[in-house]
UniProtKB/Swiss-Prot annotation:
The protein's assembly and partners: Homodimer.
Organism: Bordetella pertussis (strain Tohama I / ATCC BAA-589 / NCTC 13251)
NCBIfam families: hisC
Family matches, as InterPro entries: Aminotrans_II_pyridoxalP_BS, Aminotransferase_I/II_large, HisP_aminotrans, HistidinolP_aminotransfase, PyrdxlP-dep_Trfase, PyrdxlP-dep_Trfase_major, PyrdxlP-dep_Trfase_small
EC number: 2.6.1.9
Name used for this protein in its record: Histidinol-phosphate aminotransferase 1
Keywords tagged on the record: Amino-acid biosynthesis, Aminotransferase, Histidine biosynthesis, Pyridoxal phosphate, Transferase
Length: 356
């Protein structure tokens, strides 16, 4: 605490990122990184861009990157907004589109950055409980009285991994024509349906994605939003009031290559999905309750073993998983899908723990 802080700073409860330890030989299944490295074409593109032009500022509009994203997603380039990771994109969303003096609505169990942004920008919010089986129910987002200041949810949801169908998402969008509905699709490429094709049909729909997960670029920090031009223009106005150059030259080159290498993208995400199903079956065989997942992680609990203790005992065996000390989910572990060998090591460690 400092007497020099602005009043809002003391009220903030900042986001707590997943652990990024520097210890060697850890099996890291705690932050939903892709177990496969980026496309070789990404590394080639970054190497080619690492030249004398680094003395120059990058393109503030990121036109080439926006074009590559637009081509991959199936929209026009002026329907794309890019940022320094999807977290920055989301931060601009809250500032540009949600500050109406009315509560923003999002699930009670969801991405924990949402209430952080609300606190930072002094936006009121209302959490909407998931169902007893941890689903988002579109009926819970029907408007009642005054329109919400905004609606945002991940699809698939995080940390649960459960996904809505495209029709279910569209029900929420259609029911709230006077409210911007933001669908955070960080994990969509691992088995869910993107609603990006619907942005031409609904001017209140914004879709946010990241290259951190399915494109294996968590270390490069590139995210984007897709929506109608008026929403994108609002985001651009906030960006250019904050940082006109969020995407550096190396990140732009690597991200373009990642978006263009569809074959590598398909091959690695299919591998993750196949491993997820095997790991889920192995966990169930050990007695875990495992929620259906359309993400690159699973959410699981064991009826006879405390989740926090399990996480600690796995760490003793150099395996990291994510534990959330939060009501309703404090007996769950979120486990990132690793390589087959990493997931086999996890199952082996659990068997040893259970045999003690």
């Amino acid at each position: 605490m400092s007497r020099y802080w602005s009043p809002v700073v003391g009220t903030l409860s900042p986001y707590v990122p997943g652990e990024q330890p520097k210890l060697p030989d850890l099996i890291k299944l705690n932050t939903n990184e892709n177990p496969y490295g980026p496309s070789p074409k990404v590394l080639q593109a970054i190497a080619a861009a690492a030249g004398d032009t680094l003395k120059l500022y990058p393109d503030p509009a990121s036109d080439e990157l926006r074009g590559a994203i637009a081509a991959a997603v199936g929209v026009q380039a002026d329907q794309v907004f890019v940022g320094n990771g999807s977290d920055e994109v989301l931060a601009h969303v809250f500032m540009a589109l949600f500050r109406h003096g009315r509560p923003v609505r999002f699930p009670d169990i969801s991405y924990s950055f949402y209430p952080v942004y609300c606190g930072l920008y002094e936006i009121p919010y209302q959490v909407v409980p998931l169902t007893d089986d941890f689903r988002i129910d579109p009926a819970d987002y029907q408007p009642g009285g005054q329109a919400a200041g905004g609606i945002i949810f991940p699809n698939p949801n995080a940390p649960t991994g459960r996904a809505l169908t495209r029709d279910e998402v569209e029900r929420i969008v259609t029911a709230n024509p006077d409210t911007v509905v933001v669908v955070d699709e960080a994990y969509v490429d691992f088995g869910a349906e993107s609603v990006a094709p619907l942005v031409d049909r609904h001017d209140n729909l914004l879709v946010v994605q990241t290259l951190s997960k399915s494109r294996s670029l968590a270390g490069l920090r590139v995210g984007f939003a897709v929506g109608n031009r008026a929403l994108i223009d609002g985001l651009e106005r906030v960006k250019n009031s904050f940082n006109s150059y969020p995407i550096d030259r190396l990140a732009s080159a690597g991200a373009q290559a990642a978006m263009q290498d569809q074959a590598y993208f398909d091959r690695t995400r299919q591998a993750v999905m196949a491993t997820r199903e095997r790991m889920s079956a192995d966990l169930r065989a050990l007695g875990f309750d495992v929620l259906p997942s359309a993400a690159n992680f699973v959410f699981a609990r064991h009826p006879e073993h405390d989740a926090a203790q399990l996480a600690a005992r796995l760490r003793e065996r150099s395996i990291l998983v994510r534990y959330f000390r939060q009501a309703r989910i404090d007996q769950f572990l979120r486990i990132t899908v690793g390589t087959d060998a990493q997931c086999e090591a996890l199952i082996g460690a659990l068997k040893k723990i259970f045999s003690l």
